[in-house]
C-alpha cells in the first residue's frame, strides 16, 4: 500500500521526535517543518535531527520578518493584552505555523498535517481551526493527543525506537519562545502561590541585578510601525530583538499570570516580553497624541475583540479580517517619536512628539498665551447639559405632584 504524506510541525523536542516514529507506524511518510521565529535555537541541528529520526524531508524556514510584520506588528497596534496582561506570545505564532504547514502540504502533495499539542492546551485549537480555515480538506493529526502516554511511557517508546532523548528533558519547565517573548509553565509554576525561581527566566534580569541608572530609548514610528531606535533604522524583526536586549537588561516585561484558557481550565504561566511591553506602551502614548477622541475611545473595544480572536485561534476568521481594516485606518497618522525610560522593571514614557499631534499648547496652556475661547463654554455647557436638565425638571414635577 502506498504511503501517504504528512507534514509535521517539528520542534526537535521529545514529543515531535517520537511523533515521527509513531506516524511511520501509521504508514505515513513524514515531512518535517521547522520555522525560525526568533527563538534562538540551533535550527540547522533541528532540521538534521528530523532526518536522522526518520523524516523523508526536512524544511527549515526563516519567518522572523514575516512574523514581525504580519503578526507581532498587528498585535502591537491593537495593544493585545489578554486579560489585561498577556501579549499573546505563543498565540501569535500559531496561525503562521499553520499557514506554513498548509503551504508545504500543498506543495508536497501531502494529505495531512500534524502537530505536537496535547489535548488540554489552547494550541491544538489554534492550529486546527487555522488549518481548517486555510485548507478544509487536509486531515489534521495530533499524535500526542491520540497516544495519551505518560512521560515515562513516551521515554520508553523513544528508547525502544532509537529516538534521541533531549539532554534538557529533566527540566521541569515547558517553554515556548519567539521574537515577541517567552512563555514558561509547569514544574513549580503550577503552584500559583510559589514564587517563580530565577531559572524560570532567561530574557530579563531580576530587579536586584538591573542597573541602578535608567536608560533612555527613543522609538520612532511611521504610520504605526516602529522603525527606529535612538535614530538608527532597523528591520522590524531586528528592532524587536534589539529592544528585547535593552529592556530585558532593566527587567522590563516580566509577567506572572493565572489565565483562563480557551479549553476551560485556569493555567499559571510566566512570560517575558520586554520589547512587546515597551512597544505597546510607547505606541499607545503616540496614539493618545494623534488620534481624535472618538477614535481613541472606541478603539479599545475593537482591541479587546481582536485580542480574544487571536487568543482563541480565530486569526483567519472573517471578523478578524474585518477588524484589521478598522485597525489599519487608525494608524495613518500614528507617526512620531516616543522617549521611554527603562528602569527597574518599568518602561516609562517621558516624552512624545508628532507632526500629526492634535495637542495644541496654545489651547491647553493656562498662561497669558492662552487662545481658548472661555466665553464659548457657557453656551456649550447649556446645550451639553440640556437633556439632563430637562429630565430633572420633568421628574421633579412628578414628585411635587
Swiss-Prot record:
Annotated positions binding L-citrulline: 86, 122, 126, 174, 183, 259, 271
Protein known as: Argininosuccinate synthase
Amino acids binding L-aspartate: 118, 122-123
Annotated GO MF terms: argininosuccinate synthase activity; ATP binding
Signal peptide interval: none
One GO BP: urea cycle
Catalytic activity: L-citrulline + L-aspartate + ATP = 2-(N(omega)-L-arginino)succinate + AMP + diphosphate + H(+)
Amino acid at each position: 500500500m502506498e504511503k501517504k504524506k504528512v507534514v509535521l510541525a517539528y520542534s526537535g523536542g521529545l514529543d515531535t521526535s517520537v511523533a515521527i516514529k509513531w506516524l511511520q507506524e501509521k504508514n505515513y511518510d513524514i515531512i518535517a517543518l521547522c520555522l525560525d521565529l526568533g527563538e534562538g535555537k540551533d535550527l540547522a541541528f533541528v532540521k538534521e535531527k528530523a532526518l536522522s529520526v526518520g523524516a523523508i524531508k526536512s524544511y527549515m524556514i526563516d519567518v522572523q520578518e514575516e512574523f514581525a510584520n504580519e503578526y507581532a506588528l498587528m498585535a502591537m497596534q491593537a495593544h493585545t493584552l489578554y486579560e489585561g496582561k498577556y501579549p499573546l506570545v505563543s498565540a501569535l505564532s500559531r496561525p503562521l505555523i499553520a499557514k506554513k504547514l498548509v503551504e508545504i502540504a500543498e506543495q508536497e502533495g501531502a494529505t495531512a498535517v500534524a502537530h505536537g499539542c496535547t489535548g488540554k492546551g489552547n494550541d491544538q485549537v489554534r492550529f486546527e481551526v487555522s488549518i481548517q480555515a486555510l485548507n478544509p480538506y487536509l486531515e489534521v493529526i495530533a499524535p500526542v493527543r491520540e497516544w495519551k502516554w505518560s512521560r515515562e511511557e513516551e521515554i520508553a517508546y523513544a528508547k525502544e525506537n532509537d529516538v534521541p532523548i533531549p539532554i534538557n528533558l529533566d527540566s521541569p519547565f515547558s517553554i515556548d519562545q519567539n521574537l515577541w517573548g517567552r512563555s514558561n509553565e509547569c514544574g513549580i509554576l503550577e503552584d500559583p502561590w510559589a514564587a517563580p525561581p530565577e531559572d524560570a527566566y532567561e530574557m530579563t534580569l531580576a530587579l536586584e541585578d538591573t542597573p541602578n541608572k535608567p536608560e533612555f530609548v527613543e522609538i520612532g514610528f511611521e504610520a504605526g510601525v516602529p522603525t527606529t531606535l535612538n535614530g538608527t533604522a532597523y528591520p522590524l524583526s531586528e528592532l524587536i530583538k534589539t529592544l528585547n536586549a535593552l529592556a530585558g537588561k532593566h527587567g522590563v516585561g516580566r509577567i506572572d499570570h493565572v489565565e483562563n484558557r480557551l479549553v476551560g481550565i485556569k493555567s499559571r504561566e510566566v512570560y517575558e516580553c520586554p520589547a512587546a511591553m515597551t512597544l505597546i506602551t510607547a505606541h499607545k502614548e503616540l496614539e493618545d497624541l494623534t488620534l481624535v477622541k472618538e477614535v481613541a475611545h472606541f478603539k479599545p473595544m475593537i482591541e479587546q475583540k481582536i485580542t480574544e480572536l487571536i487568543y482563541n485561534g480565530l486569526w483567519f476568521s472573517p471578523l478578524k479580517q474585518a477588524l484589521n481594516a478598522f485597525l489599519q485606518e487608525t494608524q495613518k497618522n500614528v507617526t512620531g517619536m516616543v522617549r521611554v525610560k527603562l528602569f527597574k522593571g518599568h518602561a516609562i514614557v517621558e516624552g512624545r512628539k508628532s507632526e500629526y499631534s492634535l495637542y495644541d499648547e496654545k489651547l491647553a496652556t493656562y498662561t497669558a498665551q492662552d487662545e481658548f475661547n472661555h466665553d464659548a463654554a457657557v453656551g456649550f455647557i447649556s446645550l451639553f447639559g440640556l437633556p439632563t436638565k430637562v429630565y430633572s425638571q420633568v421628574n421633579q414635577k412628578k414628585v411635587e405632584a
